[in-house]
């Protein structure tokens, strides 16, 4: 078992959270899996709708622009040739086939587990008590949210907040308080986590309930 400290809204230690050893990956393992997962995320965000017209598709007459000989110019066949303005494109992009990259659920969950374990091992993940997300603020106050980050010694740069979906009705004050901080990259929920968000974020603040539920979900996927 690995013990992680959890903090309250004032930066004081409020207990510990246990994570099984199976959650953590060995150093250097799974790098190719993570790379494939991130490439799939980036590729599937593209529209793949880029399309150009070649010389047979552009609207031009097939008449020769000038006679073959006697003008001193290089011979030309028609204005649809790619060297002319408005002519066709050579080797341009075409939506030839579905370029959606598939990755199965087991690979996705394994990649997310590897990324989370890396954040924990490099001390870039802070576990917050559930009260931080639900009962810490009665109204949105950006100043108080910033004070919480500083009290937990969180580097104010690229911070991602992760909460449990069951707290969605009670964490609005904190979400609105964080919205005006440039250092906060986003606010999401554990079961909706995206591996690209984990890579892009420098630091992660996660609620105890979200971490327990997410870790249990990811570990159970290893046994399937």
From Swiss-Prot:
Pfam short name (any one): Ribosomal_L4
InterPro entries: Ribosomal_uL4 (IPR002136), Ribosomal_uL4-like (IPR013005), Ribosomal_uL4_dom_sf (IPR023574)
Residue numbers spanned by region Disordered: 54-73
GO cellular component, one term: ribosome
Biological process, per Gene Ontology: translation
A molecular-function term among this protein's GO annotations: rRNA binding
Keywords annotated in UniProt: Ribonucleoprotein, Ribosomal protein, RNA-binding, rRNA-binding
Domain of life: Bacteria
RNA-binding listed as a keyword: yes
Keyword ATP-binding: no
Function, in words: One of the primary rRNA binding proteins, this protein initially binds near the 5'-end of the 23S rRNA. It is important during the early stages of 50S assembly. It makes multiple contacts with different domains of the 23S rRNA in the assembled 50S subunit and ribosome. Forms part of the polypeptide exit tunnel.
Family: Belongs to the universal ribosomal protein uL4 family.
SUBUNIT field: Part of the 50S ribosomal subunit.
Protein name per UniProt: Large ribosomal subunit protein uL4
Organism for this UniProt entry: Chlamydia abortus (strain DSM 27085 / S26/3)
Organism lineage: Bacteria, Pseudomonadati, Chlamydiota, Chlamydiia, Chlamydiales
